[in-house]
Regions:
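A conserved beta-strand element that flanks and buttresses the S-adenosyl-L-methionine
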Residues: 112
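Short alpha-helix
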Residues: 167-183
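Conserved class I S-adenosyl-L-methionine
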Residues: 1-40, 56-60, 78, 141-166
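A short glycine-rich, Lys/Arg-flanked "PGG" loop and its adjoining helix->strand segment in the class I
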Residues: 124-136
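A C-terminal cap/extension of S-adenosyl-L-methionine-dependent methyltransferases
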Residues: 155, 188-247
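Class I SAM-dependent methyltransferase SAM/SAH-binding core
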Residues: 54-100
Length: 247
């Protein structure tokens, strides 16, 4: 299979997030919905968004409450694009590696990392950093790509053509065990979707078909809420109850 170089750019993600494809739009809005439900934001809270990108999720956070938001991303281009959002030229966002966050222990009330851990080779080290900078009693919200998803294998095969692209799929039970071992008391799992949030477009072939969006979306949301362990992206939310032990 021929490989092509892949780069994370604001244009790529904005094109995906704000696509005319109804399934991509649904996925993007579903992510915002889950973030706000799980984070339960309140005025005055210090909130860290790891992997803030060009600001799609960030804008939903800013609108939800008067929070003290901080964002980090490994891409300077993403940060520049985020600061082009009206009234956000001075947004406290900076370049940082998720496995070496530039914050003291227990700095934040809430820590969010969605759509990121699956693209980090050292995802366990990054997860430990998320917990480290969260205060005891604070809330962590993060997500993984699900190895139990029906789409896990075809997506892996498709992404093999992208040189330099990292995408890990994890089992929810294993990741849950990891978080518990780091001192996170978890709530129920949530899922983005099973089929409606992973649209396939290869040439003229599209699945699921756009003409069936309304029916597919309604059925898929019901199924993902009932069986989140089959969702393509699984979301975890929990409270930090102890400081993790680092050997």
């Amino acid at each position: 299979m021929n490989q092509t170089n892949f780069e994370w750019t604001p244009a790529f993600w904005q094109g995906w997030r704000e696509s005319n494809n109804p399934y991509r739009r649904y996925k993007s809005n579903r992510d915002r919905q889950l973030v706000l439900e799980l984070l339960d934001l309140h005025d005055g809270e210090r909130v860290l968004e790891v992997g803030c990108g060009y600001g799609w999720i960030s804008q939903a956070l800013w609108d939800a409450a008067q929070i003290n938001w901080f964002g980090v991303d490994q891409s300077a281009e993403m940060i520049r694009h985020l600061r082009q959002i009206p009234l956000r030229a001075d947004a406290p966002a900076s370049m940082a590696d998720a496995i070496r966050l530039p914050f003291r222990d227990g700095t934040f009330d809430k820590v969010l990392c969605t759509g990121v851990l699956m693209h980090i080779a050292q995802s366990e080290a990054a997860t430990l950093e998320l917990v480290r900078v969260l205060r005891p009693g604070g809330r962590l919200v993060c997500s993984i790509n699900n190895a139990m998803s029906p789409y896990a294998l075809p997506v892996r095969v498709w992404n093999n053509r992208k040189r330099g692209f990292v995408q890990n799929f994890s089992f929810p039970r294993s990741f849950r065990k990891l978080l518990v071992g780091m001192g996170i008391k978890l709530g129920a799992l949530r899922g983005d979707g099973i089929a409606a949030t992973v649209p396939l477009n290869i040439g003229r072939f599209q699945f699921p078909p756009s003409s069936l969006f309304s029916s597919v979306q309604a059925l898929d949301e019901w199924a993902a809420n009932r069986w989140p362990c089959l969702a393509y992206e699984v979301w975890f939310s929990g409270i930090k109850i102890v400081r993790p032990c680092v050997s």
